[in-house]
Amino acid sequence: MKAFSPVRSVRKNSLSDHSLGISRSKTPVDDPMSLLYNMNDCYSKLKELVPSIPQNKKVTKMEILQHVIDYILDLQIALDSHPTIVSLHHQRPGQNQTSRTPLTTLNTDISILSLQASEFPSELMSNDSKVLCG
């Protein structure tokens, strides 16, 4: 006599499963759409957190990243120029202040970066299944 296992119906994850964050024990490498949804969630979170990004206007992912970089540099400058920090950490001789690149300069490189962006997904995939934004 042979043992038979019951046949399970194969069901694709519905959009509601993704929006609820329900995972069917797949890693991002196994499910590229899940990785895409997670990345889009991360971009949405960044858009909410950075005050210089207009909330009522659609912005590209590249623009979001540019605003994030600008915001981080602004915060670094604010920290570096705070009187308490300045008195604690005197600038070493020969060490220059980091200069900030304006967004307009970064926008000129978008075409180059967008051509290279097609290579990123395969390079960034890892076996790490942690969700970075959430």
UniProtKB/Swiss-Prot annotation:
Phosphorylated in vitro by CDK1, PKA and PKC. It comes from the Eukaryota. GO terms for molecular function: protein dimerization activity; RNA polymerase II-specific DNA-binding transcription factor binding; transcription corepressor activity; transcription regulator inhibitor activity; transmembrane transporter binding. Residues 23-75 form the bHLH domain. InterPro entries: bHLH_dom, DNA-bd_prot-inh, HLH_DNA-bd_sf. The modification Phosphoserine is found at S14, S25. A motif (Nuclear export signal) lies at residues 106-115. Keywords: Biological rhythms, Cytoplasm, Developmental protein, Nucleus, Phosphoprotein, Repressor, Transcription, Transcription regulation, Ubl conjugation. It is found in: Cytoplasm; Nucleus. GO terms for cellular component: chromatin; cytoplasm; cytosol; euchromatin; nucleus; protein-containing complex. One of its GO terms (biological process) is negative regulation of gene expression. Its main location: cytoplasm. Pfam families: HLH. Transcriptional regulator (lacking a basic DNA binding domain) which negatively regulates the basic helix-loop-helix (bHLH) transcription factors by forming heterodimers and inhibiting their DNA binding and transcriptional activity. Implicated in regulating a variety of cellular processes, including cellular growth, senescence, differentiation, apoptosis, angiogenesis, and neoplastic transformation. Inhibits skeletal muscle and cardiac myocyte differentiation. Regulates the circadian clock by repressing the transcriptional activator activity of the CLOCK-BMAL1 heterodimer. Interacts with GATA4 and NKX2-5. Interacts with NR0B2. Interacts with CLOCK and BMAL1. Interacts with IFI204. Interacts with NEDD9/HEF1. Interacts with ASB4; this interaction promotes ID2 proteasomal degradation. PANTHER family: DNA-BINDING PROTEIN INHIBITOR, DNA-BINDING PROTEIN INHIBITOR ID-2. The bHLH domain is essential for its repressor activity towards the CLOCK-BMAL1 heterodimer. This is DNA-binding protein inhibitor ID-2. It comes from Rattus norvegicus (Rat).
